[in-house]
Design a protein with these regions (language model features):
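Acidic, Mg2+-coordinating active-site environments of NTP-dependent enzymes
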Residues: 1-101, 126-128, 153-163, 169-176
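Short amphipathic alpha-helix with an adjacent loop that forms part of the alpha/beta core around
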Residues: 187-195
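Short SAM/SAH-binding signature in class I
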Residues: 63, 194-203
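Hydrophobic "anchor" residues on beta-strands that sit immediately upstream
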Residues: 100-104, 131-132, 199
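Active-site beta-alpha connecting loops in nucleotide-dependent enzymes
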Residues: 87-90, 106-179, 183, 205
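Short amphipathic alpha-helical segments
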Residues: 2-6, 115-116, 145-146, 176-178, ...
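ATP-dependent carboxylate/acyl-activation modules
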Residues: 89-92, 210-215
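A short, gly/pro- and small-residue-rich
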Residues: 9-14, 213-219
Length: 219
C-alpha cells in the first residue's frame, strides 16, 4: 500500500502522532460522552470532550481531522469543530424509561463494530445490570457461524452474568443466551427481564431491525 501511494500526497491518522499527521489518544468515557487528546504533527495538541463514546470514535475523529488538514483547515479550527459532532438516529441513542437505560445502536453491525461496542460498554457497564440484545450480522458468507459464536463468547466472557438475548438464525444454538428468530418476539421477554437500574444495549444488522425489540419510546 505504501508503495502504491508513493506518487500521491498522503495524510496518515492513528494513535501515535510520531507516525501520523493526526493522532487521537483516547482518555476514557461514559455512556454519553468521552475525552480524547487530538495531536497534530505540526505540534498542536488539544484535550477535547464530545458527545460520542468509545475508543473507536476517537479514531474516527483523527480520520476526520486528517481529511481537514489535507484541505488546509487549521488545527485550531478542526479542534473547535470536531467537538460538535453528533450521531444520527439508532447510533448509540440513549433513552431512559421507568428507571431503565436503553441504548439503541441498531442501525447496523459487523464483527468489528460489535467488538468495539462491547469494549466500550466494558468501560462502565456493570455486568449484573446489563442486558444485551444482539441481532445477527449479515453478509458474512462462510464465516457467518464462526463470527456469531465468537460474538457470543466475547459477550459472555467480557460480562460475566450478563443477560444475553440473540436475534436471528445465524446465531444458532448458543449456550448462555436466549435465542429469538425475530426482533418483535423479544419485546415481551425483555419487559419481564429488565429491572430498575438496568442498562439495555441493542445492536444488529439493519435487516434484523433489532430496535423493534425495544420499547417504542426507545426506538
Amino acid at each position: 500500500l505504501e508503495t502504491a501511494a508513493e506518487s500521491y500526497r498522503v495524510f496518515r491518522f492513528g494513535e501515535d502522532v510520531s507516525r501520523c499527521d493526526v493522532a487521537a489518544r483516547y482518555l476514557g468515557g461514559t455512556l454519553e460522552g468521552s475525552r480524547f487528546e487530538l495531536s497534530f504533527r505540526t505540534g498542536e495538541r488539544f484535550t477535547l470532550e464530545w458527545a460520542l463514546t468509545g475508543r473507536h470514535q476517537a479514531r474516527n475523529a483523527a480520520a476526520a481531522a486528517a481529511l481537514a488538514v489535507a484541505i488546509g483547515i487549521p488545527p485550531e479550527t478542526i479542534a473547535a469543530g470536531v467537538v460538535h459532532a453528533r450521531l444520527p438516529g439508532m447510533r448509540s441513542k440513549v433513552t431512559r424509561l421507568d428507571g431503565v437505560t436503553y441504548v439503541n445502536d441498531a442501525y447496523n453491525a459487523n464483527p468489528g463494530s460489535m467488538r468495539a461496542a462491547l469494549a466500550n460498554l466494558a468501560e462502565f457497564a456493570d455486568p449484573a445490570r446489563l442486558v444485551l440484545v444482539l441481532g445477527e450480522m449479515r453478509e458474512l458468507g462462510g464465516s457467518e457461524a464462526a463470527e456469531h459464536r465468537a460474538l457470543v463468547e466475547n459477550a459472555l466472557q467480557t460480562f460475566p452474568g450478563v443477560r444475553l438475548l440473540t436475534v436471528g438464525r445465524a446465531f444458532g444454538e448458543c449456550p448462555g443466551a436466549l435465542r429469538f428468530d425475530r426482533s418483535e418476539e423479544v419485546v415481551e421477554t425483555l419487559a419481564k427481564l429488565v429491572r430498575d437500574g438496568d442498562l439495555v444495549f441493542a445492536k444488529g444488522s439493519r435487516g434484523i431491525a433489532v430496535e423493534l425489540a425495544l420499547p417504542e419510546a426507545a426506538r
